[in-house]
A protein has these predicted regions:
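Flexible coil/turn and secondary-structure edge motifs
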Residues: 2-148
Length: 148
């Protein structure tokens, strides 16, 4: 049985292709999550009116890859110490955020944030939130880097 995780770590194109290559991750999809509306568009998200983050939704097999390993990778592929930015991308849609589905995911994510606060220089600014108002991004964003 697959498990699901939704993660925000900057522009969703790069993280999607990276997560899709992990052994045990069977499906990735980019979208928007954590905003004030149940539906949104890329333009609305970029304008900053909806408070959605660009996210990667992934379905994984916990018998092959653990939730902890996915979160380890999450912390490795972006800078969780920069507020509302990754590289040259700035705005709340590029924030670092872990969206949890249940209390077990929430508790594990809290421990992982504590772990990386001890390892990394700089304070972790990754938010931890229950999944709210997820919607799939437009088709042209799906597998964007694979299409190039």
């Amino acid at each position: 049985m697959y498990k699901r995780q939704i993660l925000a770590c900057g522009c969703f194109w790069g993280p999607e292709i990276k997560f899709s290559k992990l052994n045990g991750v069977y499906k990735t999809e980019v979208g928007y999550c954590g905003g004030n509306t149940s539906k949104t568009s890329y333009q609305e998200v970029c304008e900053g009116d909806t408070n959605h983050a660009e996210v990667v939704k992934l379905d994984f097999d916990p018998n092959i890859i653990s939730y902890e390993k996915i979160l380890d990778y999450f912390f490795e592929i972006h800078d969780p110490t920069t507020l509302n930015s990754q590289g040259l991308d700035f705005g709340t849609q590029y924030r670092s955020e872990i969206f949890y589905l249940n209390d077990n995911q929430k508790n594990i994510a809290k421990k992982m944030i504590e772990k990386y606060n001890k390892i990394l220089s700089g304070k972790i600014v990754t938010k931890l939130s229950q999944i709210k108002n997820y919607c799939t991004a437009e088709e042209y964003h799906q597998k964007y880097l694979e299409k190039r």
